[in-house]
Amino acid sequence: MSTVEERVKKIVCEQLGVKEGDVQLTSKFVEDLGADSLDTVELVMALEEEFETEIPDEEAEKITTVQDAIDYILANQ
């Protein structure tokens, strides 16, 4: 089983069409990885599906980096 970090990075790569080497823990989805608002919504939906959790909109707005996503998943598993 992959770690949460590996799974989050894989989803980010798939959703945003970026190379794994370009995805750092500090990478911001919009500024660093070129995501737009639709991309971020789809990214949150993919994370919800992968980790079988629900991320409320007010929490989703706070998830702006790869590390934010990992931290949220770990805190809410």
Swiss-Prot record:
It is found in: Cytoplasm. Residues 2-77 form the Carrier domain. Keywords: Cytoplasm, Fatty acid biosynthesis, Fatty acid metabolism, Lipid biosynthesis, Lipid metabolism, Phosphopantetheine, Phosphoprotein. InterPro entries: ACP, ACP-like_sf, PP-bd_ACP, Ppantetheine_attach_site. Pathway: Lipid metabolism; fatty acid biosynthesis. One of its GO terms (biological process) is lipid A biosynthetic process. GO terms for molecular function: acyl binding; acyl carrier activity. 4'-phosphopantetheine is transferred from CoA to a specific serine of apo-ACP by AcpS. This modification is essential for activity because fatty acids are bound in thioester linkage to the sulfhydryl of the prosthetic group. One of its GO terms (cellular component) is membrane. The modification O-(pantetheine 4'-phosphoryl)serine is found at residue 37. PANTHER family: ACYL CARRIER PROTEIN, CARRIER DOMAIN-CONTAINING PROTEIN. Carrier of the growing fatty acid chain in fatty acid biosynthesis. Belongs to the acyl carrier protein (ACP) family. This is Acyl carrier protein. The gene is acpP.
